[in-house]
Amino acid sequence: MTKGILGKKVGMTQIFTESGEFIPVTVIEATPNVVLQVKTVETDGYEAIQVGFDDKREVLSNKPAKGHVAKANTAPKRFIREFKNIEGLEVGAEITVDIFAAGDVVDVTGTSKGKGFQGVIKRHGQSRGPMAHGSRYHRRPGSMGPVAPNRVFKNKHLAGRMGGNRVTIQNLEIVQVIPEKNVILIKGNVPGAKKSLITIKSAVKAAK
């Protein structure tokens, strides 16, 4: 069965194992998520649970949003997402970090840091041209393709806006879970800036 929770990225640190191994970890704070709705095939056409995370002031919510969360007897939520293939939860139930344990393999989704308008070298990793005095080609995008089509093909690597995309990193290991602090430590780095929304789910390609 799939397990999932929403959290916020706190930052990175490092821990040492009992054997002295150094492990860089990302700290994710995941306060209890609340099940706001249970979707079924009969009513919605598919099965899923809708989860809310991070309370916000009622003055910032409209009447439909307040009525929606009232069914779960909770405060309005800043982030609402869905998880599929999760069973046994009812409206109003809480999902806490202790659904995961050290050693679990998960997929982590976040929004990558926005870098603004960047050239092809930074954005796509292209090599620059010669920097010699006689060269007139340094950081340009290169050939636009053959003459015959009379156009530039789609997906040509060009300068443009970089970052700010939804990114999923698969098969990351959970190093430690601290239930009393609502914290999960994940090995390595995860996409996103500090305080950004992070989705943690059971890995779909984990070795069985």
From Swiss-Prot:
It comes from Streptococcus equi subsp. zooepidemicus (strain MGCS10565). One of its GO terms (biological process) is translation. The lineage of its organism: Bacteria, Bacillati, Bacillota, Bacilli, Lactobacillales. Gene3D superfamilies: 3.30.160.810, Translation factors (2.40.30.10). The gene is rplC. The keyword rRNA-binding applies. Belongs to the universal ribosomal protein uL3 family. This is Large ribosomal subunit protein uL3. The keyword NADP does not apply. One of the primary rRNA binding proteins, it binds directly near the 3'-end of the 23S rRNA, where it nucleates assembly of the 50S subunit.
